[in-house]
Amino acid sequence: MEKIIVRGGKRLNGTVRVEGAKNAVLPIIAAALLASDGKNVLSEVPVLSDVYTINEVLRHLNAEVVFENNQVTIDASKELNIEAPFEYVRKMRASVQVMGPLLARNGRARIALPGGCAIGSRPIDQHLKGFEAMGAKVQVGNGFVEAYVEGELKGAKIYLDFPSVGATENIMSAATLAKGTTILENAAKEPEIVDLANFLNAMGAKVRGAGTGTIRIEGVDKLYGANHSIIPDRIEAGTFMVAAAITGGDILIENAVPEHLRSITAKMEEMGVKIIEENEGVRVIGPDKLKAVDIKTMPHPGFPTDMQSQMMALLLQADGTSMITETVFENRFMHVEEFRRMNADIKIEGRSVIMNGPNSLQGAEVAATDLRAAAALILAGLVSEGYTRVTELKHLDRGYVNFHKKLAALGATIERVNEKVEEVKEQEVSDLHA
């Protein structure tokens, strides 16, 4: 078993560059299945385990996929298979994003019910509601969901009960080849939605209104391969913003898009963090003393749920009582118990977490419960006394490229070790950046 060992006490300084956005690239790779003519070439693709997984799903579906030098080339011009099996989908719920493209191309899709992070139930009912509105019949059973349409999908007016990002993406992709116009209301507004729409349009689709609550998709007969560059990862950028703030450091985050970070920036400035927009990205300077604030996660442009656990680590260092309320996913507080192991004064009250600070955190052995919790525990380790050992790194690798190496380059005392060689003594780790 691999672990990340971090010793607290260092201010982080320097420059770090964020990768292409994980939450943008996965639905875009899935949407590449829509192109029945030509190759799609995607650049700025992060080297993540989830990207390898979705690539394997596409290969199983009979697409040709080459991934090298942060570039993915996809040829989906051959006849596609219709089934994405459990062995792939169990690893990552984003695999369900192939359903809309398969349904549009083949008129049929059979997908194992999805896996991924253990964050509540995260149902796909809104996806299926959209497919049914466009004329598909849906059956769920034996661990699979199957959708099929006689003839072709038809444009429809669809209202989402909740602005689900995944449902917006899946329905938008399916509607590109439907007959007629689809109007998707109460759609998600995330930057990743806009990125997918830009890719679809580059392939020849007619998508308008992405980034607003109403998206119009006029169906076309065929889509073609295109070139597209993935937007920068706003969650990775936000994570390094917290790294600067929590250590009282000074970090320039290159390739960050300030407009995508407004809600994060607003809350951090409220805490006393100095944030400067520069041509290269965003510079973050941590204060000597952090102020307590309250945060409520919301769909975009509200505060992103994917930054909740990282901000929790930061608020543990704030002076006073802070509260985070989670409105997007249930059961996304599994990391609270791990923070308690580090001596945090923190408690759960319903859908909220109350923190009293500042906390004198102590290093401990902790387990990542999901992707963002993995990053949050490492961030907490940066300001803990002694050594923090974080396990279950499979979660971290789903969303961060060389996270420990990037932190080390900024001055953190941190190493990733394999348990077999963890006779690497604490002193050796402490000497890493002496």
UniProtKB/Swiss-Prot annotation:
NCBIfam families (alphabetical): murA (TIGR01072), PRK09369.1 (NF006873), PRK12830.1 (NF009470)
The name this protein goes by in its record: UDP-N-acetylglucosamine 1-carboxyvinyltransferase 1
Similarity section: Belongs to the EPSP synthase family. MurA subfamily.
SUPFAM superfamilies, alphabetized: EPT/RTPC-like
Organism this protein belongs to: Bacillus cereus (strain ATCC 10987 / NRS 248)
Gene name as annotated: murA1
Cross-referenced PANTHER family: UDP-N-ACETYLGLUCOSAMINE 1-CARBOXYVINYLTRANSFERASE (PTHR43783:SF1)
Residues holding UDP-N-acetyl-alpha-D-glucosamine: R93, R122, P123, I124, D125, Q126, D306, V328
The EC number(s) this enzyme carries: 2.5.1.7
